[in-house]
Amino acid sequence: MRRYDFALTWVNSEQERFVQWLKRECKLRSMDMLVAGPDNIRSAVKDVEEGRLRIKFLLDNEAAYNEPIDIYARFCYAVKDTGGLVVCDPDYARAASNKSITHYDLIRSGIDVPYTIIVRNWQPDTFCLTPEEKKHLGGGFIIKPASGFGQKGIIKSATGSIAEIASARNFNRGDNFLLQEKMAPVTLDDKMAWFRVYYIFGEVIPCWWDTQTGRYAHVTLKEFSAHKLLPLVRIISEIARITRLEFFSSELALVKTVSGARKFVAVDYVNDQPELCVRPAAINGPLEDVTEHIAARCVEYAYRRIGNYPAQYFRQVTLAKLNLVDETI
């Protein structure tokens, strides 16, 4: 039987820096690593199911649990069923990736979310909003599939006509759809107060994220203190508790209420497969320092779990590295 200490599901190039960092970290710990992608995923599934291959730890980046038959989801279950540890656990990820489920979980836990109408997949194409619902949704609201990801199937400036809602649902007739109030974040130091926050094994990594440009910026200690961003940590930690996911990202926005007070709102609830492909600064994308840190953290966690060492699952907030020439504090 072949055995691998660490495996990754990945459909992009293995030359991506995230994959190279994982390989480096595995090599440092003398761990064998398998990348399961388009060329070998089917044979890998068969080998695991038939006892010829054993995976001790799997980091999943590809499973589509909303698809009736998805080979990567099957691989996750095969690894779990043969005693391997899967991050994220396929049963938890399946539930958490459905926004029509997570929406109510967050509300019950006291987390603020946008005003939302959920259209179930069995409702007719003649579904229409009441005047009161249209009023609460406001002009130019969002329509998105409950199990969607990667901005797919989203309408960003909906008006609420019967034809428009029916057309949006054609993206996936078997899915529920969320009609969601559009959030307008406040501005803090010339930055849009919209955050993409990573949660990884108890650790919280907050980043600014511009929804218009896709630009990331790691939150600094000075910003974290000056703008009172500690609620980001509380909210994403509560989402982790609710969903039981160990690694994910969430989008949180700071908005102004009708009364003038500010509050943090969970906008895109859970992404159990965060964006991890580093891109040149001109293109924008996840930050190199953050992504490299995540790679190291994943392998270290796997090493400790499969070696029965203390897993270092602790609460901490990781902020941007200090520039000792131009202090950020």
What are these regions (language model features)?
Residues 1-8:
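Extreme N-terminal starter segment of soluble prokaryotic enzymes
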Residues 106-107, 131-153, 174-188:
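ATP-grasp fold ATP-binding core
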Residues 71-74, 190-194, 247-248:
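Short, surface-exposed coil-to-beta transition loops
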Residues 10-124:
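Conserved N-proximal alpha/beta basic substrate-recognition cap immediately N-terminal to
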Residues 92-93, 120-124, 146-150, 160-162, ...:
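Short acidic/polar capping segments at secondary-structure boundaries
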Residues 254-329:
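C-terminal active-site "lid" helix and adjoining low-complexity regulatory extension at the edge
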Residues 155-240:
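Phosphate-binding site of ATP-dependent enzymes
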Residues 250-252:
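Hydrophobic residue at the +6 position relative to the catalytic HRD Asp in the kinase catalytic loop
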